Amino acid sequence: AVEVQSLVTNSVLPTPRRAVNGVDPSRIAMLVAVLYRHGGISLLQNDLYISTIAGGQAKEPGCDLAITAAMASAALNKPIAKNVCAIGEISLTGQVRPVPRLEYRLREAQRLGFTKAIVPATQKPLKMEGMTLAPATNLKDALAFLHLAKQRH
């Protein structure tokens, strides 16, 4: 399990700054675009700082949903509950895709105190004793579960 933190600030630079630690910078660029296109949250004019805690690495696609949730949370200034984790790869179309060893990841998250998890809707298990699993088909589903869905006017 890897904790991901994100800070979003208004940029005064012509090209906004992207500072990352423990995360693949090219993956962040892709996730920023997907968050804008499929989540309605634009970070294109913002400085973005993303870091993993305690030297952890979030460089595999199964961390996409957690990273994107952290960015959306920071952009909207709405914290994610401490007992919620997010596991899943995000495609360019905004779909939440299956990840290897989901059951192992969920057991580890549960051991660390998480009681709710957003998981790919197309992947088993969709039940786990002592943990509420929220199946997400796409990024909008995941953001809605986290109360981070962008309000349309």
List each model region and its residues:
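Peripheral, non-AAA+ core regions of ATP-driven protein-machinery
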Residues: 1-153
